[in-house]
Protein backbone atom coordinates (compact mmCIF):
# COMPACT_ATOMS: atom_id res chain seq x y z
CA UNK A 1 0.00 0.00 0.00
CA UNK A 2 1.36 3.40 -0.98
CA UNK A 3 1.73 6.23 1.50
CA UNK A 4 -0.98 8.22 -0.27
CA UNK A 5 -3.55 5.44 0.15
CA UNK A 6 -2.52 5.03 3.79
CA UNK A 7 -3.87 8.51 4.50
CA UNK A 8 -7.21 7.96 2.76
CA UNK A 9 -10.33 7.47 4.91
CA UNK A 10 -12.32 4.23 4.95
CA UNK A 11 -14.48 3.71 1.87
CA UNK A 12 -17.91 2.24 2.60
CA UNK A 13 -20.27 0.84 -0.01
CA UNK A 14 -23.94 1.13 1.03
CA UNK A 15 -26.57 -0.90 -0.83
CA UNK A 16 -30.29 -0.63 0.08
CA UNK A 17 -33.27 -2.55 -1.28
CA UNK A 18 -34.66 -0.10 -3.86
CA UNK A 19 -37.93 0.91 -2.22
CA UNK A 20 -38.54 4.23 -0.50
CA UNK A 21 -38.46 3.22 3.17
CA UNK A 22 -35.22 1.26 2.80
CA UNK A 23 -33.49 3.87 0.64
CA UNK A 24 -34.52 6.70 2.97
CA UNK A 25 -33.23 4.94 6.08
CA UNK A 26 -29.90 4.02 4.50
CA UNK A 27 -29.41 7.51 3.04
CA UNK A 28 -29.54 8.82 6.60
CA UNK A 29 -26.92 6.27 7.61
CA UNK A 30 -24.81 7.42 4.65
CA UNK A 31 -25.00 11.03 5.78
CA UNK A 32 -24.12 10.09 9.37
CA UNK A 33 -21.01 8.31 8.08
CA UNK A 34 -20.18 11.27 5.81
CA UNK A 35 -20.23 13.48 8.90
CA UNK A 36 -17.60 11.13 10.36
CA UNK A 37 -15.52 11.88 7.22
CA UNK A 38 -15.82 8.44 5.65
CA UNK A 39 -16.01 8.03 1.86
CA UNK A 40 -19.34 6.58 0.71
CA UNK A 41 -20.43 4.91 -2.53
CA UNK A 42 -24.22 4.56 -2.44
CA UNK A 43 -25.73 1.98 -4.81
CA UNK A 44 -29.18 3.18 -5.88
CA UNK A 45 -31.62 1.91 -8.49
CA UNK A 46 -32.04 4.11 -11.55
CA UNK A 47 -35.76 4.42 -10.74
CA UNK A 48 -35.11 5.47 -7.14
CA UNK A 49 -32.34 7.87 -8.17
CA UNK A 50 -34.53 9.68 -10.70
CA UNK A 51 -37.32 10.06 -8.11
CA UNK A 52 -34.91 11.35 -5.48
CA UNK A 53 -33.36 13.91 -7.82
CA UNK A 54 -36.80 15.07 -9.00
CA UNK A 55 -38.64 15.31 -5.67
CA UNK A 56 -36.05 15.90 -2.92
CA UNK A 57 -33.09 18.04 -1.91
CA UNK A 58 -30.78 15.03 -2.06
CA UNK A 59 -28.42 16.63 -4.61
CA UNK A 60 -27.79 19.76 -2.54
CA UNK A 61 -27.88 17.78 0.70
CA UNK A 62 -24.95 15.57 -0.29
CA UNK A 63 -23.06 18.23 -2.29
CA UNK A 64 -21.35 19.29 0.95
CA UNK A 65 -19.77 15.82 1.29
CA UNK A 66 -17.01 15.44 -1.35
CA UNK A 67 -16.50 11.82 -0.32
CA UNK A 68 -20.07 10.81 -1.26
CA UNK A 69 -21.10 9.43 -4.64
CA UNK A 70 -24.24 7.78 -6.03
CA UNK A 71 -23.83 4.73 -8.26
CA UNK A 72 -27.09 4.01 -10.16
CA UNK A 73 -27.98 0.46 -11.20
CA UNK A 74 -31.04 -1.22 -12.72
CA UNK A 75 -33.58 -2.83 -10.37
CA UNK A 76 -34.69 -5.06 -13.25
CA UNK A 77 -38.28 -3.79 -13.32
CA UNK A 78 -39.88 -1.78 -16.16
CA UNK A 79 -40.33 1.95 -15.57
CA UNK A 80 -44.13 1.61 -15.46
CA UNK A 81 -44.08 -1.06 -12.74
CA UNK A 82 -46.02 0.32 -9.72
CA UNK A 83 -43.54 -0.87 -7.06
CA UNK A 84 -46.45 -0.66 -4.57
CA UNK A 85 -49.17 -2.84 -3.09
CA UNK A 86 -48.69 -6.58 -3.38
CA UNK A 87 -46.51 -6.05 -6.46
CA UNK A 88 -43.81 -4.40 -4.37
CA UNK A 89 -42.64 -7.95 -3.62
CA UNK A 90 -41.57 -8.25 -7.27
CA UNK A 91 -38.52 -6.24 -6.27
CA UNK A 92 -36.97 -9.19 -4.38
CA UNK A 93 -36.61 -11.69 -7.25
CA UNK A 94 -35.84 -8.83 -9.63
CA UNK A 95 -32.92 -7.52 -7.59
CA UNK A 96 -31.62 -11.04 -7.06
CA UNK A 97 -31.83 -12.10 -10.72
CA UNK A 98 -31.06 -8.82 -12.50
CA UNK A 99 -29.38 -6.40 -10.08
CA UNK A 100 -27.19 -9.07 -8.48
CA UNK A 101 -25.19 -9.97 -11.61
CA UNK A 102 -25.02 -6.29 -12.64
CA UNK A 103 -23.65 -5.39 -9.20
CA UNK A 104 -20.96 -8.05 -9.40
CA UNK A 105 -19.97 -6.88 -12.89
CA UNK A 106 -19.93 -3.24 -11.75
CA UNK A 107 -17.70 -4.00 -8.78
CA UNK A 108 -15.18 -5.92 -10.89
CA UNK A 109 -15.09 -3.39 -13.74
CA UNK A 110 -14.67 -0.46 -11.34
CA UNK A 111 -12.05 -2.26 -9.22
CA UNK A 112 -14.30 -1.84 -6.19
CA UNK A 113 -14.50 1.90 -6.94
CA UNK A 114 -10.89 2.59 -6.01
CA UNK A 115 -9.10 5.61 -7.49
CA UNK A 116 -6.20 7.95 -6.79
CA UNK A 117 -8.34 9.71 -4.18
CA UNK A 118 -10.31 6.71 -2.90
CA UNK A 119 -9.16 3.45 -1.43
CA UNK A 120 -10.92 0.23 -2.53
CA UNK A 121 -14.08 -0.67 -0.64
CA UNK A 122 -13.28 -1.10 3.06
CA UNK A 123 -16.59 -2.79 3.84
CA UNK A 124 -20.06 -3.31 2.41
CA UNK A 125 -23.11 -2.20 4.38
CA UNK A 126 -25.91 -4.05 2.61
CA UNK A 127 -29.61 -4.14 3.21
CA UNK A 128 -30.28 -7.29 5.21
CA UNK A 129 -32.50 -8.75 2.48
CA UNK A 130 -29.85 -8.49 -0.26
CA UNK A 131 -28.02 -11.75 0.33
CA UNK A 132 -26.33 -11.56 -3.10
CA UNK A 133 -24.36 -8.55 -1.82
CA UNK A 134 -23.29 -10.71 1.11
CA UNK A 135 -22.29 -13.48 -1.29
CA UNK A 136 -20.06 -11.06 -3.20
CA UNK A 137 -18.50 -9.73 0.00
CA UNK A 138 -17.67 -13.26 1.15
CA UNK A 139 -16.31 -14.23 -2.27
CA UNK A 140 -13.97 -11.21 -2.36
CA UNK A 141 -13.07 -11.22 1.32
CA UNK A 142 -14.65 -7.80 1.94
CA UNK A 143 -16.01 -7.26 5.48
CA UNK A 144 -19.81 -7.34 5.52
CA UNK A 145 -22.21 -5.36 7.72
CA UNK A 146 -25.95 -5.84 7.38
CA UNK A 147 -28.39 -2.99 7.97
CA UNK A 148 -31.88 -4.22 8.83
CA UNK A 149 -34.28 -1.33 8.20
CA UNK A 150 -37.13 -2.94 10.16
CA UNK A 151 -37.75 -2.88 13.91
CA UNK A 152 -35.82 -5.21 16.20
CA UNK A 153 -39.08 -6.92 17.17
CA UNK A 154 -39.91 -7.67 13.54
CA UNK A 155 -36.40 -8.88 12.74
CA UNK A 156 -36.42 -11.16 15.77
CA UNK A 157 -39.82 -12.67 14.91
CA UNK A 158 -38.56 -13.38 11.38
CA UNK A 159 -35.35 -14.84 12.79
CA UNK A 160 -37.48 -17.30 14.77
CA UNK A 161 -39.26 -18.49 11.60
CA UNK A 162 -37.98 -22.10 11.78
CA UNK A 163 -39.31 -22.41 15.34
CA UNK A 164 -42.63 -20.84 14.31
CA UNK A 165 -43.00 -23.38 11.52
CA UNK A 166 -42.03 -26.25 13.82
CA UNK A 167 -44.58 -25.18 16.44
CA UNK A 168 -47.38 -25.00 13.85
CA UNK A 169 -47.93 -21.26 14.23
CA UNK A 170 -47.09 -20.89 10.54
CA UNK A 171 -48.85 -21.21 8.18
CA UNK A 172 -51.72 -19.38 9.90
CA UNK A 173 -54.94 -21.29 9.26
CA UNK A 174 -58.60 -21.09 10.22
CA UNK A 175 -59.80 -19.04 13.17
CA UNK A 176 -56.62 -19.19 15.22
CA UNK A 177 -55.47 -15.63 14.58
CA UNK A 178 -55.71 -14.61 18.25
CA UNK A 179 -53.80 -17.58 19.65
CA UNK A 180 -50.69 -16.54 21.60
CA UNK A 181 -47.40 -17.45 19.94
CA UNK A 182 -44.88 -19.14 22.25
CA UNK A 183 -41.97 -19.62 19.83
CA UNK A 184 -40.50 -16.10 19.87
CA UNK A 185 -38.43 -15.63 23.06
CA UNK A 186 -39.27 -12.38 24.81
CA UNK A 187 -42.77 -12.16 23.31
CA UNK A 188 -44.43 -15.25 24.80
CA UNK A 189 -47.12 -13.36 26.71
CA UNK A 190 -48.52 -10.93 24.15
CA UNK A 191 -47.67 -11.86 20.55
CA UNK A 192 -50.67 -13.28 18.65
CA UNK A 193 -50.57 -15.06 15.33
CA UNK A 194 -52.21 -12.04 13.69
CA UNK A 195 -49.25 -9.93 14.89
CA UNK A 196 -46.65 -11.99 13.04
CA UNK A 197 -45.07 -10.32 9.99
CA UNK A 198 -47.49 -10.26 7.07
CA UNK A 199 -45.41 -12.70 5.02
CA UNK A 200 -46.45 -15.40 7.50
CA UNK A 201 -50.04 -15.26 6.23
CA UNK A 202 -49.65 -18.03 3.70
CA UNK A 203 -51.40 -21.33 3.02
CA UNK A 204 -48.24 -23.34 2.51
CA UNK A 205 -44.85 -23.14 4.23
CA UNK A 206 -43.22 -23.65 0.82
CA UNK A 207 -44.68 -20.40 -0.52
CA UNK A 208 -41.78 -18.45 -2.10
CA UNK A 209 -42.19 -15.18 -0.17
CA UNK A 210 -42.11 -17.03 3.16
CA UNK A 211 -39.04 -19.01 2.19
CA UNK A 212 -37.29 -15.83 0.97
CA UNK A 213 -38.00 -14.15 4.31
CA UNK A 214 -36.77 -17.15 6.27
CA UNK A 215 -33.57 -17.52 4.23
CA UNK A 216 -32.69 -13.82 4.05
CA UNK A 217 -33.20 -13.33 7.79
CA UNK A 218 -31.20 -16.32 8.98
CA UNK A 219 -28.24 -15.53 6.72
CA UNK A 220 -27.79 -12.19 8.51
CA UNK A 221 -25.59 -13.93 11.10
CA UNK A 222 -22.76 -14.42 8.59
CA UNK A 223 -22.04 -10.68 8.63
CA UNK A 224 -19.25 -9.35 10.82
CA UNK A 225 -21.70 -6.82 12.30
CA UNK A 226 -25.28 -5.59 12.01
CA UNK A 227 -27.02 -2.22 12.34
CA UNK A 228 -30.58 -1.53 13.49
CA UNK A 229 -32.48 1.75 13.33
CA UNK A 230 -33.79 1.59 16.89
CA UNK A 231 -32.66 2.50 20.40
CA UNK A 232 -32.00 0.58 23.59
CA UNK A 233 -34.78 2.11 25.70
CA UNK A 234 -37.35 1.21 23.06
CA UNK A 235 -36.49 -2.42 22.27
CA UNK A 236 -33.89 -3.41 24.87
CA UNK A 237 -35.31 -6.84 25.83
CA UNK A 238 -35.60 -7.90 22.18
CA UNK A 239 -32.12 -6.58 21.38
CA UNK A 240 -30.78 -8.79 24.17
CA UNK A 241 -32.27 -11.82 22.41
CA UNK A 242 -30.77 -10.84 19.05
CA UNK A 243 -27.31 -10.26 20.57
CA UNK A 244 -27.17 -13.92 21.59
CA UNK A 245 -26.81 -14.65 17.86
CA UNK A 246 -25.24 -11.38 16.66
CA UNK A 247 -23.11 -9.87 19.42
CA UNK A 248 -21.70 -7.02 17.29
CA UNK A 249 -25.00 -5.17 16.91
CA UNK A 250 -25.08 -1.38 16.57
CA UNK A 251 -28.36 0.39 17.37
CA UNK A 252 -28.15 3.93 15.99
CA UNK A 253 -31.75 5.15 15.87
CA UNK A 254 -33.97 6.96 15.48
CA UNK A 255 -31.74 7.80 12.52
CA UNK A 256 -33.64 10.90 11.38
CA UNK A 257 -33.35 12.44 14.85
CA UNK A 258 -29.75 11.24 15.18
CA UNK A 259 -28.84 13.00 11.95
CA UNK A 260 -30.34 16.25 13.22
CA UNK A 261 -28.38 15.89 16.47
CA UNK A 262 -25.05 15.34 14.68
CA UNK A 263 -25.61 18.23 12.27
CA UNK A 264 -26.36 20.55 15.19
CA UNK A 265 -23.21 19.35 16.99
CA UNK A 266 -21.17 20.42 13.96
CA UNK A 267 -23.10 23.71 13.65
CA UNK A 268 -24.35 22.73 10.21
CA UNK A 269 -27.66 24.25 9.16
CA UNK A 270 -30.25 21.50 9.44
CA UNK A 271 -32.96 21.02 6.88
CA UNK A 272 -35.38 18.12 7.23
CA UNK A 273 -33.86 15.47 4.98
CA UNK A 274 -36.66 14.13 2.84
CA UNK A 275 -36.10 10.91 0.95
CA UNK A 276 -39.51 10.93 -0.69
CA UNK A 277 -40.18 9.45 -4.12
CA UNK A 278 -43.21 11.77 -4.39
CA UNK A 279 -43.60 15.51 -4.76
CA UNK A 280 -44.55 17.06 -1.42
CA UNK A 281 -47.54 19.41 -1.25
CA UNK A 282 -46.53 22.02 1.31
CA UNK A 283 -49.92 23.75 1.26
CA UNK A 284 -50.93 21.39 4.07
CA UNK A 285 -48.49 23.16 6.42
CA UNK A 286 -50.30 26.45 5.81
CA UNK A 287 -53.59 24.70 6.60
CA UNK A 288 -52.13 23.26 9.81
CA UNK A 289 -50.98 26.73 10.86
CA UNK A 290 -54.63 27.75 11.10
CA UNK A 291 -55.70 24.81 13.32
CA UNK A 292 -55.78 24.67 17.16
CA UNK A 293 -53.01 22.82 19.04
CA UNK A 294 -53.20 19.00 19.08
CA UNK A 295 -56.52 19.08 17.19
CA UNK A 296 -55.62 17.38 13.89
CA UNK A 297 -55.35 13.67 13.09
CA UNK A 298 -52.67 13.10 10.45
CA UNK A 299 -53.56 10.19 8.12
CA UNK A 300 -50.96 8.53 5.90
CA UNK A 301 -50.43 4.92 4.89
CA UNK A 302 -46.93 5.32 3.49
CA UNK A 303 -45.34 4.71 0.12
CA UNK A 304 -46.55 1.16 -0.59
CA UNK A 305 -50.06 0.63 0.83
CA UNK A 306 -52.98 0.49 -1.59
CA UNK A 307 -56.66 0.42 -0.61
CA UNK A 308 -59.82 -0.65 -2.37
CA UNK A 309 -62.56 1.87 -3.11
CA UNK A 310 -64.69 0.27 -0.36
CA UNK A 311 -61.87 0.67 2.17
CA UNK A 312 -61.35 4.24 1.03
CA UNK A 313 -65.00 5.07 1.70
CA UNK A 314 -64.97 3.37 5.12
CA UNK A 315 -61.95 5.42 6.18
CA UNK A 316 -63.44 8.58 4.74
CA UNK A 317 -66.80 8.14 6.47
CA UNK A 318 -65.04 7.20 9.70
CA UNK A 319 -62.90 10.33 9.63
CA UNK A 320 -65.77 12.67 8.73
CA UNK A 321 -68.18 11.08 11.22
CA UNK A 322 -65.62 11.28 14.04
CA UNK A 323 -66.05 15.05 14.06
CA UNK A 324 -62.26 15.52 14.29
CA UNK A 325 -60.06 17.63 12.05
CA UNK A 326 -57.87 15.54 9.75
CA UNK A 327 -55.04 15.92 7.25
CA UNK A 328 -55.08 12.97 4.85
CA UNK A 329 -52.26 11.97 2.50
CA UNK A 330 -53.62 10.07 -0.49
CA UNK A 331 -50.92 9.00 -2.94
CA UNK A 332 -51.93 9.17 -6.61
CA UNK A 333 -51.44 5.39 -6.96
CA UNK A 334 -52.88 4.35 -3.60
CA UNK A 335 -56.39 3.34 -4.73
CA UNK A 336 -57.06 0.07 -6.54
CA UNK A 337 -59.04 0.31 -9.76
CA UNK A 338 -59.38 3.09 -12.27
CA UNK A 339 -62.42 4.82 -10.80
CA UNK A 340 -60.53 5.64 -7.57
CA UNK A 341 -62.04 8.80 -6.17
CA UNK A 342 -64.81 9.13 -8.78
CA UNK A 343 -68.36 9.72 -7.58
CA UNK A 344 -67.48 10.65 -4.01
CA UNK A 345 -70.71 11.11 -1.99
CA UNK A 346 -71.66 14.74 -1.38
CA UNK A 347 -71.74 14.35 2.42
CA UNK A 348 -68.08 13.27 2.41
CA UNK A 349 -67.07 16.23 0.28
CA UNK A 350 -68.91 18.60 2.60
CA UNK A 351 -67.45 17.01 5.74
CA UNK A 352 -63.94 17.24 4.30
CA UNK A 353 -64.35 20.90 3.38
CA UNK A 354 -65.48 21.63 6.94
CA UNK A 355 -62.79 19.78 8.90
CA UNK A 356 -60.34 18.09 6.55
CA UNK A 357 -57.51 18.66 4.10
CA UNK A 358 -56.19 16.20 1.52
CA UNK A 359 -52.87 16.11 -0.35
CA UNK A 360 -51.06 13.64 -2.61
CA UNK A 361 -47.93 13.62 -0.42
CA UNK A 362 -46.82 15.61 2.62
CA UNK A 363 -43.53 16.58 4.30
CA UNK A 364 -44.23 13.99 6.99
CA UNK A 365 -41.50 14.72 9.51
CA UNK A 366 -42.40 18.42 9.49
CA UNK A 367 -46.12 17.62 9.73
CA UNK A 368 -45.69 15.28 12.71
CA UNK A 369 -43.73 17.96 14.56
CA UNK A 370 -46.37 20.63 13.90
CA UNK A 371 -48.14 21.77 17.10
CA UNK A 372 -51.57 21.22 15.49
CA UNK A 373 -51.04 17.46 15.17
CA UNK A 374 -52.59 15.38 17.96
CA UNK A 375 -52.56 11.88 16.45
CA UNK A 376 -51.37 9.78 13.53
CA UNK A 377 -53.43 7.16 11.68
CA UNK A 378 -50.59 5.14 10.18
CA UNK A 379 -49.72 1.93 8.32
CA UNK A 380 -47.07 1.31 11.01
CA UNK A 381 -44.07 1.29 8.71
CA UNK A 382 -40.94 1.49 10.85
CA UNK A 383 -39.74 4.88 9.61
CA UNK A 384 -43.18 6.39 10.21
CA UNK A 385 -43.40 4.77 13.65
CA UNK A 386 -40.03 6.22 14.69
CA UNK A 387 -40.89 9.66 13.31
CA UNK A 388 -44.12 9.61 15.32
CA UNK A 389 -42.29 8.49 18.47
CA UNK A 390 -39.72 11.30 18.20
CA UNK A 391 -42.48 13.85 17.60
CA UNK A 392 -44.43 12.61 20.63
CA UNK A 393 -47.53 11.84 18.56
CA UNK A 394 -49.82 8.92 19.59
CA UNK A 395 -50.87 6.49 16.85
CA UNK A 396 -53.79 4.52 15.48
CA UNK A 397 -52.22 1.61 13.62
CA UNK A 398 -53.71 0.06 10.48
CA UNK A 399 -50.86 -2.16 9.25
CA UNK A 400 -50.79 -3.26 5.64
CA UNK A 401 -48.13 -5.98 5.42
CA UNK A 402 -44.63 -7.14 6.39
CA UNK A 403 -43.15 -5.77 9.65
CA UNK A 404 -46.09 -3.40 10.13
CA UNK A 405 -48.18 -6.14 11.79
CA UNK A 406 -45.81 -6.61 14.73
CA UNK A 407 -44.93 -2.90 14.97
CA UNK A 408 -48.58 -2.09 15.62
CA UNK A 409 -48.76 -4.65 18.44
CA UNK A 410 -45.76 -3.11 20.18
CA UNK A 411 -47.21 0.40 19.80
CA UNK A 412 -50.45 -0.63 21.51
CA UNK A 413 -49.48 -3.39 23.96
CA UNK A 414 -45.88 -2.75 24.98
CA UNK A 415 -45.17 0.94 24.51
CA UNK A 416 -48.84 1.89 25.03
CA UNK A 417 -48.61 4.96 22.81
CA UNK A 418 -51.50 4.12 20.52
CA UNK A 419 -54.23 1.77 19.36
CA UNK A 420 -54.06 -1.27 17.07
CA UNK A 421 -56.76 -1.46 14.38
CA UNK A 422 -55.32 -4.28 12.27
CA UNK A 423 -57.55 -6.58 10.23
CA UNK A 424 -60.58 -4.31 10.38
CA UNK A 425 -61.76 -1.46 8.22
CA UNK A 426 -65.26 -0.27 9.06
CA UNK A 427 -66.43 3.26 9.72
CA UNK A 428 -67.83 2.59 13.20
CA UNK A 429 -64.52 1.18 14.45
CA UNK A 430 -62.65 4.10 12.88
CA UNK A 431 -64.95 6.63 14.58
CA UNK A 432 -64.51 4.86 17.92
CA UNK A 433 -60.71 4.70 17.69
CA UNK A 434 -60.30 8.28 16.47
CA UNK A 435 -62.41 9.60 19.34
CA UNK A 436 -60.59 7.40 21.86
CA UNK A 437 -57.20 8.71 20.71
CA UNK A 438 -58.14 12.35 20.12
CA UNK A 439 -60.70 12.88 22.92
CA UNK A 440 -61.40 10.20 25.52
CA UNK A 441 -57.82 9.09 26.32
CA UNK A 442 -56.04 12.03 24.71
CA UNK A 443 -54.12 13.22 27.78
CA UNK A 444 -53.06 9.68 28.73
CA UNK A 445 -51.67 8.93 25.27
CA UNK A 446 -49.97 12.30 24.92
CA UNK A 447 -48.26 11.90 28.29
CA UNK A 448 -46.85 8.47 27.36
CA UNK A 449 -45.85 9.63 23.88
CA UNK A 450 -44.07 12.65 25.34
CA UNK A 451 -42.09 10.39 27.69
CA UNK A 452 -41.05 8.10 24.82
CA UNK A 453 -40.05 11.12 22.71
CA UNK A 454 -37.71 12.27 25.48
CA UNK A 455 -36.08 8.82 25.65
CA UNK A 456 -35.62 8.82 21.86
CA UNK A 457 -33.97 12.23 21.87
CA UNK A 458 -31.71 11.28 24.79
CA UNK A 459 -30.53 8.20 22.84
CA UNK A 460 -29.24 10.34 19.95
CA UNK A 461 -27.75 13.11 22.10
CA UNK A 462 -24.08 13.12 23.10
CA UNK A 463 -23.57 10.36 25.67
CA UNK A 464 -26.77 8.57 24.65
CA UNK A 465 -26.84 4.90 23.61
CA UNK A 466 -27.33 5.45 19.87
CA UNK A 467 -24.83 8.32 19.78
CA UNK A 468 -22.20 6.12 21.42
CA UNK A 469 -23.07 3.15 19.20
CA UNK A 470 -22.57 5.20 16.03
CA UNK A 471 -19.15 6.27 17.31
CA UNK A 472 -18.45 2.60 17.94
CA UNK A 473 -19.56 1.69 14.42
CA UNK A 474 -17.24 4.30 12.89
CA UNK A 475 -14.33 3.05 15.01
CA UNK A 476 -15.09 -0.52 13.94
CA UNK A 477 -15.11 0.44 10.25
CA UNK A 478 -11.77 2.26 10.69
CA UNK A 479 -10.34 -0.88 12.28
CA UNK A 480 -11.12 -2.85 9.10
CA UNK A 481 -8.50 -0.97 7.06
CA UNK A 482 -5.67 -3.38 6.35
Curated annotation (Swiss-Prot):
Domain of life: Eukaryota
EC number: 2.4.1.323
Keyword Nucleus tagged: yes
Keywords in alphabetical order: Cytoplasm, Glycosyltransferase, Nucleus, Transferase
Record field: catalytic activity: 7-deoxyloganetate + UDP-alpha-D-glucose = 7-deoxyloganate + UDP + H(+)
Glycosyltransferase keyword on record: yes
Active site (record annotation): 22 (proton acceptor), 127 (charge relay)
Record pathway: Alkaloid biosynthesis
Record-linked Pfam families: UDPGT
Subcellular location: Nucleus; Cytoplasm, Cytosol
Residues at which an anthocyanidin binds: 22, 402
One cellular component (GO) term of this entry: nucleus
Expressing tissues: Expressed in the leaf internal phloem-associated parenchyma (IPAP) inside the mesophyll. Mostly observed in leaves, roots and stems, and, to a lower extent, in flowers.
Positions annotated to bind UDP-alpha-D-glucose: 149, 362, 364, 379, 382-384, 387, 403-404
Induction context: By jasmonic acid (MeJA).
Any one GO molecular-function label of the UniProt entry: quercetin 3-O-glucosyltransferase activity
Mutant lacking the gene: phenotype: Large decline in secologanin and monoterpene indole alkaloids (MIAs) accumulation.
Family stated for the protein in its record: Belongs to the UDP-glycosyltransferase family.
Function: Component of the seco-iridoid and derivatives monoterpenoid indole alkaloids (MIAs, e.g. vincristine, quinine, and strychnine) biosynthesis pathway. Catalyzes the glucosylation of 7-deoxyloganetic acid to form 7-deoxyloganic acid using UDP-glucose as the sugar donor. Inactive with loganetic acid, loganetin, iridodial, iridotrial, 8-OH-geraniol, jasmonic acid, gibberellic acid, indole acetic acid, salicylic acid, abscisic acid, zeatin and luteolin.
Protein name: 7-deoxyloganetic acid glucosyl transferase
Organism the protein comes from: Catharanthus roseus
